[in-house]
Amino acid sequence: MAVGKNKRLTKGGKKGAKKKVVDPFSKKDWYDVKAPAMFNIRNIGKTLVTRTQGTKIASDGLKGRVFEVSLADLQNDEVAFRKFKLITEDVQGKNCLTNFHGMDLTRDKMCSMVKKWQTMIEAHVDVKTTDGYLLRLFCVGFTKKRNNQIRKTSYAQHQQVRQIRKKMMEIMTREVQTNDLKEVVNKLIPDSIGKDIEKACQSIYPLHDVFVRKVKMLKKPKFELGKLMELHGEGSSSGKATGDETGAKVERADGYEPPVQESV
């Protein structure tokens, strides 16, 4: 028999011994996700993040997280085909304060609108809001039969399609350019822009199912906490605090000296 180590008596026990399993969730915390004040339901859910450890701060891991929420959950409504994207911009305590980051229609709604025997008209435009957000809006609309029409198809001529597309771009630009982001989101919730386009294009060719189908956020201005707090309905309290910090100048007569205190 070859002379060597007795492997069974080696130090440290078995080589393949199992390590003690640590539950990764024991190092994580739950944070509440808060939607801006323009929505009816503010508390939209919870999110997990690893606790602050050394240089790795928990709030940094939360900032920039994007949550996609159905409008039905935000407005406590039955109409559920619009999805809003909300991005975490700041963390206060256990609350993640979010801001608008985009909008989309659900796939099933989009597929249910596309049919035969009609023309689909699409347009997109890049617009800047008054408070410096650059948005790209996509619009979609479909031609419909006139009231007294017998023919099965309702196809628009190319010239009419171009006119409708031009009208779509004009209305989207006008509605966004003259408002700030909060007002734009308030218009996207009931989709008043789509209804305006439908009305304006009736004279060119009757349309139905006109929607702003998507909104992308292209550029944002520099982050300001005050503006985010305003969106969350806490602007007045935070505004006062910042205003009072500067202090007020006290009027004093020339050569004024404070009185000498007898005891300190």
UniProtKB/Swiss-Prot annotation:
Short name of any one Pfam family annotated for the protein: Ribosomal_S3Ae
PROSITE patterns: RIBOSOMAL_S3AE
Annotated positions of the ADP-ribosyltyrosine modification: 155
SMART domains membership: Ribosomal_S3Ae
Keyword Ubl conjugation among record annotations: yes
Major site of localization recorded for this protein: cytoplasm
InterPro entries per UniProt: Ribosomal_eS1 (IPR001593), Ribosomal_eS1_CS (IPR018281), Ribosomal_eS1_euk (IPR027500)
Keyword Cell cycle: no
Top-level taxonomic group: Eukaryota
GO cellular component, one term: cytosolic small ribosomal subunit
Description of post-translational modifications: ADP-ribosylated at Tyr-155 by PARP1 in presence of HPF1.
Cross-link (Glycyl lysine isopeptide (Lys-Gly) (interchain with G-Cter in SUMO2)): 34, 249
Molecular functions (GO terms): mRNA 5'-UTR binding; RNA binding; structural constituent of ribosome
Residues modified to Phosphoserine: 236-237, 263
Positions of post-translational Phosphotyrosine modification: 256
Spans annotated as Disordered: 232-264
UniProt function note: Component of the small ribosomal subunit. The ribosome is a large ribonucleoprotein complex responsible for the synthesis of proteins in the cell. Part of the small subunit (SSU) processome, first precursor of the small eukaryotic ribosomal subunit. During the assembly of the SSU processome in the nucleolus, many ribosome biogenesis factors, an RNA chaperone and ribosomal proteins associate with the nascent pre-rRNA and work in concert to generate RNA folding, modifications, rearrangements and cleavage as well as targeted degradation of pre-ribosomal RNA by the RNA exosome.
Subunit structure and binding partners: Component of the small ribosomal subunit. Mature ribosomes consist of a small (40S) and a large (60S) subunit. The 40S subunit contains about 33 different proteins and 1 molecule of RNA (18S). The 60S subunit contains about 49 different proteins and 3 molecules of RNA (28S, 5.8S and 5S). Identified in a IGF2BP1-dependent mRNP granule complex containing untranslated mRNAs. Binds with high affinity to IPO4. Interacts with DDIT3. Part of the small subunit (SSU) processome, composed of more than 70 proteins and the RNA chaperone small nucleolar RNA (snoRNA) U3.
Name recorded for this polypeptide: Small ribosomal subunit protein eS1
